[in-house]
Amino acid sequence: MHIHEYQAKTLFRCRDIQIPKGILIDNTTKINDVCKALGGDVWVVKAQIHAGGRGKGGGVIFCHSIEKVERVCNQLLGSKLITPQTDAKGLPVGQLLIEAKQNIERELYLSLLIDRQTHKITVLSSTKGGMDIEKVASKTPDKIIKFGIDPLGSLSVQDCTFLAKKLGFNTELTKQFNNTLLSLYEIFTQKDVNLIEINPLIITQENKLLALDGKIDFDDNALYRHKDIAKLRDISQEDEKERLASEYQLNYILFDGNIGCMVNGAGLAMATMDLIEHFGGSPANFLDVGGGTTADRVAKAFELIQTETNVKSILVNIFGGIVHCDLIAQGILQAIKTVGLTLPIVVRLEGTNAPEGLNLLNKSKFNIHVESDLTKAAIKIVKLTK
């Protein structure tokens, strides 16, 4: 689960990580008071959306007058912001964070994430922070400092000091950096975080270390342990269909293709999409109905797929282990009748009671083509779509 920048900064402030003074708004009635309360003569208006690249998308704007602040706020509030990290539709802007401009001496990058290769929490830091950090990582990876933390151990002050030296900090900045990194590590480990990032982490002309931005991604599966974090969820930033799918324990991701996919198991779902692509088709979605597939869940899956106007056909690929294929077939027939589906469907069943399930589907009056071989099923669905 992602949260907004202002929410991340609130968590930072509670852990004594230094952040700029900012005021959150959702309307423009008191812009003059906001700017005066922040002080200074240049302000930064920052759109609050769950995506990076806001600066490149026009969502972070410097204003040299209160009049411009008001004009920019009116333009952004209620709009949809498109950035390099959103789709073509963009994300709705319902809130803005206004901050006074900082006197920046240097921009750095700092994050913690789970490294799947080393199986460690890894600190990433760089002296080249800012909007082009992705370019730095791809073109000059030597500029990124990596430090792995033993999952059975902890992050020490000595570890932080080691990284501070790598970044060229003096004694005062090292003290501030150590506090910042140790606090980030506490949030990461205590709140079941997947990624926590400050970009940029700035050094001001006053020799202060400030988190100018904040990004946190929490493990959805651990939210039951963190009711305070779960309350920070903003469903306006989520794809509506993906949100509805999650309520039925369906893992659903929308693509741009025209062949709907319904599969049980993430690995099998990816293999199914690969085969469709291999034979010249284009998947419209990733949809994993999970191991405990029920008729209701299958019906909801068909309903989600059918709402996409670009979908021309559907491939169902089920491997019956604990779940019996004949029960799955009954669920498919019930779901098709309930949803009123008329698109051509190819169903591949394999596993427990697969012959019985395929026989049930063959006898039905619906537009269903059955296969026991996945390759043949992929070829068939591509032909039907063309």
From Swiss-Prot:
Query: Gene encoding it?
Result: sucC
* EC number annotated for this UniProt entry: 6.2.1.5
Q: Write the lineage as a comma-separated list.
A: Bacteria, Pseudomonadati, Pseudomonadota, Gammaproteobacteria, Candidatus Pseudothioglobaceae
This chain's source organism reads Ruthia magnifica subsp. Calyptogena magnifica
Residues bound to Mg(2+) are: 199, 213
Q: Which NCBIfam families match?
A: PRK00696.1, sucCoAbeta
Has UniProt tagged this entry with the keyword Ligase?
Answer: yes
Q: Which Pfam families match?
A: ATP-grasp_2, Ligase_CoA
- Protein's name according to its UniProt entry: Succinate--CoA ligase [ADP-forming] subunit beta
Function, as annotated = Succinyl-CoA synthetase functions in the citric acid cycle (TCA), coupling the hydrolysis of succinyl-CoA to the synthesis of either ATP or GTP and thus represents the only step of substrate-level phosphorylation in the TCA. The beta subunit provides nucleotide specificity of the enzyme and binds the substrate succinate, while the binding sites for coenzyme A and phosphate are found in the alpha subunit.
Q: Which residues form a coiled coil?
A: none
Q: Which residues bind substrate?
A: 264, 321-323
Q: Name one GO cellular component term.
A: cytosol
Its keywords, alphabetically, are: ATP-binding, Ligase, Magnesium, Metal-binding, Nucleotide-binding, Tricarboxylic acid cycle
Q: How does it assemble?
A: Heterotetramer of two alpha and two beta subunits.
Superkingdom of the organism of origin: Bacteria
Q: Where does ATP bind?
A: 46, 53-55, 99, 102, 107
| Example of a GO biological process term | succinyl-CoA metabolic process
Give the reactions, separated by semicolons, that this protein catalyses: succinate + ATP + CoA = succinyl-CoA + ADP + phosphate; GTP + succinate + CoA = succinyl-CoA + GDP + phosphate
